[in-house]
């Protein structure tokens, strides 16, 4: 007899449980007197909650650097004291999620929540950049299922679209929910999602950022460690 397929709800529950498992492990990486980059997104939010428990229960002395208004609110709710990037001097570790991770290179795509510019600044500035995900996010080739988000200055959106079409990419302006019109980032800019062939992630990252009007793109190539939640355990992958 064939094994019955899981419903979408069951798959979602499994994914959520793996994210929680990974978030708990990531919280154990944080030590007293660390400055911690706080990523954005569902997995990063779970990490922030778990870290907040340690701050309260163990009186862990740390500061967090948020990467979005959303992560700022979650940190405030979780009891994590915050510090700005220009105040902290350096960031010991940044913990963030991902939308897609290349199995071979650990290059990744982020930005489903439209926060990738601030995330990349904090993640790249940190001494160590750790990514959290469940095993469904691992892919053989980056960009298989997920478009690369570009944060674009509104003044230049039409010229950016034209340039992307000329290089055989497939761009689309991201629309908002709860309001008419495009998504507007925390920085006041637009998001263009683009499907593009990624043979070399570093080259594509640099090329997209060279387009006038593009503030930052969602390809990240400087991950140091990946924590992957599986049904059996949390796997720690290093370059």
UniProtKB/Swiss-Prot annotation:
Pfam families on file: Rib_5-P_isom_A
Record: residues binding substrate: 40-43, 96-99, 110-113, 137
Enzyme class per UniProt: isomerase
Chemical reaction(s) catalysed: aldehydo-D-ribose 5-phosphate = D-ribulose 5-phosphate
CDD domains: RPI_A
Gene3D superfamilies: 3.30.70.260, 3.40.50.1360
Gene Ontology BP annotations: D-ribose metabolic process; pentose-phosphate shunt, non-oxidative branch
An annotated Gene Ontology molecular function: ribose-5-phosphate isomerase activity
Subunit comment: Homodimer.
NCBIfam families noted in UniProt: PRK00702.1, rpiA
Family the UniProt entry places it in: Belongs to the ribose 5-phosphate isomerase family.
Record protein name field: Ribose-5-phosphate isomerase A
Taxonomic source organism: Methanococcus vannielii (strain ATCC 35089 / DSM 1224 / JCM 13029 / OCM 148 / SB)
Gene from which the chain derives: rpiA
